[in-house]
Amino acid sequence: MKISANSIRTGNILVYNNDLWVVSKTPEHTQPGKGGAYVQVEMKNLKTGTKRNERFSSADYLDKAELEQKDYQFLYFEGDDLVLMDTKHFDQINISKEMLEEKLSFLTENIIVKVEFYNDKPLNIELPPTVILEISETDPVIKGATATASYKPAILENGIKVKVPQYLEIGEKIVVKTDDMTYVERAK
């Protein structure tokens, strides 16, 4: 499938120079005073792991990889792999931890993730947009802090540090965005 260079987003998997590349940073759209507009894209080769910056004209069209997406349930870690189970057919697969990198700490028991396949080979794991986690460390509640819009640091059960409202206490569950690791709301 062809997409415009202006439509490239972080996480897109492109077929470029006969290799698969994942867009690793938000593309920069630039309109210089002289010359045509272009898009600066940082990509990572899925086979070799090498990173590369590439500049495409805004008028260019690139091949976006046709991916098949399936729901899988995270079961457990086995060495350097994640063990996932297909939610429809109950088949289990092992996928390298490296595929998730810094998002690995969001994996909780039984979480449902989307695994993207290219030619029956797992390429990418998409976490749900938000997860519910428990606060394990934070400063004590300050009386009257509900009226102010200030935040305090908190460490969650998975070790991630986030800023939370002053009124939250240790042991409370909160909703956290998985893409930028920010607090959304108190879990219901």
Swiss-Prot record:
Subcellular location per the Swiss-Prot or TrEMBL entry: Cytoplasm
A GO cellular-component term linked to this record: cytoplasm
Keywords: Cytoplasm, Elongation factor, Protein biosynthesis
Pathway where it operates: Protein biosynthesis; polypeptide chain elongation
Alphabetical list of SMART domains matching this protein: EFP, Elong-fact-P_C
GO molecular function, one term: translation elongation factor activity
Keyword Protein biosynthesis: yes
CDD domains membership: S1_EF-P_repeat_1
InterPro entries, A to Z: Elong-fact-P_C, NA-bd_OB-fold, Rib_uL2_dom2, Transl_elong_fac_P/YeiP, Transl_elong_KOW-like, Transl_elong_P/YeiP_cen, Transl_elong_P/YeiP_CS, Transl_elongation_fac_P
GO biological process, alphabetically ordered: peptide biosynthetic process
Classification via NCBIfam families: efp, PRK00529.1
Function: Involved in peptide bond synthesis. Stimulates efficient translation and peptide-bond synthesis on native or reconstituted 70S ribosomes in vitro. Probably functions indirectly by altering the affinity of the ribosome for aminoacyl-tRNA, thus increasing their reactivity as acceptors for peptidyl transferase.
Family: Belongs to the elongation factor P family.
HAMAP family tied to this protein: EF_P (MF_00141)
Protein name, per record: Elongation factor P
Organism expressing this protein natively: Rickettsia peacockii (strain Rustic)
Lineage: Bacteria, Pseudomonadati, Pseudomonadota, Alphaproteobacteria, Rickettsiales
